Amino acid sequence: MKRMICVLGLACVSLGVAAQQSFPTSQKEDKEQIMSEAYWKIWNPSVQKQIDQDIEKYRKANGVVFLEEAVPGTSVQIKQVSHDFVFGASMFNFNQLGTPAANQRYKELFGTLFNRATVPFYWEPFEMQPGRPRFREEYWDTEAYWNRQENPKYQPHWRRPAPDPMIAYCESHGVPVHGHPLTWGSRRWQHPNWIVDQILTDEERETLKQYVAEYADEKNFLNGDKMTPAFEKATLAELEAKLPELGPKLQKLIDKRITEIVKYYGDRVSSWDVVNESAQDYAKGAMVPGSKLCKSNYGFMPGDYTFEAFKTTASVVSENALMNINDYWGGPEYAEQIKDLQKRGARIDVAGSQMHLFDPKQCLDIAAGKEIQTPTQIWKLMNSLTETGLPIHLSEITITSPGSDLKGQQIQAVIAQNLYRLWFSCKNMMGITWWNVVDDCGAPGEPSVSGLFFRDMSPKLSYYALENLINHAWKTETEVKAGKNGEVKFRGFRGNYEITYTDKAGNEQTVTYHLK
């Protein structure tokens, strides 16, 4: 794209008209040197040309439609109304933004900018009490409750709404739902603290004292349990001998959770992150087929828990729902793990890959020209994942603005523009999901400036960057002439179209068409 992106007049979801501001899309446009010369050298015209060529090659297709009643030589209007490609976002702040107006603006993004919503199923806040999953809305999930909270982030279910009302909203607006995550080893964000008391005998709890120095929770900010030197020294066989039932008990509990959630929603959830962030355990050889325990990076996990999670999910999931694996791991071990699981018979439909620039300094470094998330690095990772033969979902995307001032917004917008274009151009890419949509609405410890919107739901420049790409640059709208026998040919982005023409009787007709 060789023109300056101006946000004047680009209004969406009742956001109103923004002040006239812009951000550069090339070094030639960057008169104020928002980005360094070194940055533009990395994202040079040759790279941009390759991206454009790959978008044309991988994201578009040729359409042929026969309109029997169309008069040859007359005009036919071709208008794309939706994408096959997934442009998603997490919906974690549903009804939690403090005012009806902010909540309404947030919800309306789903179906206008975003065509898929990631809905949270983190175990600890979803099942705070054993046997009492939070499917349905209770008072503390309502907009009225959240509007009264002075410090909403201190609530235990912040960013973890009950899923029923979220999914109902998505269904009413034609937005598919992605469930995240079913299985994850994280103690801080996933495993409930009640597990230890619920499934362990007194003897097992006493034995665990040798190996667990401190259990992770929301207060100590540990992602995994703090293990003792004895745990690190012990062999897997020694641990299994001392705790022979621990792994099977954990697996049984995980299987119960998967079965309950997946059966409850059936076809209403179109895809699931079956396992989240397990590649590190695979990379260090901790998951051993046939074993009862895994010496996980998080602490004790069931042996071979990734394979077991896919096996359990496959036994209960709808045939229409996709089963994803998801990870931040950037090394070759992630693709190797997927191929190993496939070889052993695991059904995996999509490879999820995360990209979080959580530290605002990272974006300053990128603007300065440091080699962080460069085209070469991204192509290498995507090519590695392509070897699995799976579609790729950029499942969690964080791009921070170094500040809330104009320059900080411009840096975020430029980085988002170039990264989205590159990701969109990758051969096996099927979707990109932005993580925190609103500033200051992430999880504790995450940056407060990673949104597309300020806290009051006023748009940042990064919003306009994405809105222009998704709803303008990457949507096909053209006019062609009807050929003989009403044949209509066009080339466009894959998705659903409305095709409008005047029939032989002089009446306007509209047909729908899916370009695959």
Cite the ranges covered by each PLM segment.
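Beta-strand-rich domain onsets/edges
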Residues: 21-96, 116, 128-129, 135-136, ...
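Conserved, mostly hydrophobic/aromatic
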Residues: 65, 117, 170, 261, ...
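Short Pro-Gly-centered beta-turn/loop motif in secreted/extracellular proteins
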Residues: 99-113, 489-498
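Aromatic-lined substrate-binding rim segments of carbohydrate-active enzymes
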Residues: 111-114, 120-237, 241, 252-254, ...
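Aromatic-rich peripheral "rim/lid" segments of glycoside hydrolase catalytic domains that contact
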Residues: 28-41, 197-218, 222, 228-236, ...
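Active-site beta-loop-alpha junctions enriched in small/polar residues
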Residues: 90-94, 122, 182-184, 274-277, ...
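Hydrophobic h-region of N-terminal signal peptides that target proteins for export
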Residues: 10-18
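Glycoside hydrolase catalytic-domain groove-lining segments
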Residues: 136, 143, 157-176, 287-404, ...
